[in-house]
Structure formats: C-alpha cells, structure tokens
Amino acid sequence: MPKMKSHSGASKRFKVSGSGKLMRQKAGRRHLLEHKSSRVTRRLDGVAVVSPDDAPRIKRMLGI
C-alpha cells in the first residue's frame, strides 16, 4: 500500500506543539489592519490551540 500523503495546505497552517497539541494562527490579521484598533490586533497575535472537535480531522490531514 502506498504512503499516505499529508495535506500540504494543512501542513502549512498547523504545527504540533511539544505536548502534542495542534497550534494555529488566529484569523483576521493579514491585511485591512488600518481600521482595526491596536487592541484588536494585539488580541489576534500569537498562536491558538485548535478546537478539540476539529483536531481529529486535522490530524488525519497531517498524517499524525
């Protein structure tokens, strides 16, 4: 049986932390930032943990 291919789009968007959690970037901080407050842009920086409901599907896409 051939090897499973990981979903290349998912592999660019999600990383696995040291403890095994899936990490993602928050949406809404790429462009059109001029009208957003500094408070909002600060809230959107950093990484977030993927929802437990979405994690199994994403793990399957990553081949984990």
Swiss-Prot record:
The keyword Ribosomal protein applies. It holds the Pfam family Ribosomal_L35p. Keywords: Ribonucleoprotein, Ribosomal protein. Gene3D superfamilies: 4.10.410.60. SUPFAM superfamilies: L35p-like (SSF143034). PROSITE patterns: RIBOSOMAL_L35. GO terms for molecular function: structural constituent of ribosome. Belongs to the bacterial ribosomal protein bL35 family. HAMAP family: Ribosomal_bL35 (MF_00514). This is Large ribosomal subunit protein bL35. It comes from Rhodococcus erythropolis (strain PR4 / NBRC 100887). The gene is rpmI.
